[in-house]
């Protein structure tokens, strides 16, 4: 899978890449912020070693029943990233493997969505 990922997304290497992730395990008590941050830093390092730079990582720790605005498919984290990094979402692309990823992009005003 990893080799297909890198060949498929090599065209994104010149773009700003943000990682927006739901991690309800934090609020469920299954994992900790420290563990999630360690995993995210491992992913960041791995991807950077492959030539893909991750500009920032955004994590929602909430469970579905908490009804927050940051858990995908809500657009909260995408809007926050847009504001913090001065990103025009209408000119951005969201790539995700879940319907909620694509819905979050659409809810944030992205016109280009790719489901893998």
Set out the residue ranges of the language-model regions:
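Basic, amphipathic juxtamembrane/active-site segments
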Residues: 1-8
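Substrate-recognition element of Asp-dependent hydrolases with the DxDx(T/V) motif
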Residues: 9-40, 52-66, 105
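Acidic, Mg2+-coordinating phosphoryl-transfer loop and its flanking beta/alpha structural elements
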Residues: 94-116
């Amino acid at each position: 899978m990893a080799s297909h990922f890198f060949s498929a997304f090599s065209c994104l290497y010149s773009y700003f890449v943000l990682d927006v992730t739901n991690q309800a395990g934090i609020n469920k008590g299954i994992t900790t912020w420290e563990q999630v941050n360690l995993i995210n830093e491992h992913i960041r390092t791995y991807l950077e070693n492959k030539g893909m730079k991750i500009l920032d990582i955004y994590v929602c720790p909430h469970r579905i029943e908490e009804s927050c605005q940051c858990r995908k498919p809500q657009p909260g984290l995408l809007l926050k990233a847009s504001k913090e990094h001065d990103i025009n979402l209408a000119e951005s692309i969201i790539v995700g493997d879940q319907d909620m990823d694509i819905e979050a992009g659409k809810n944030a005003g992205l016109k280009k969505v790719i489901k893998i």
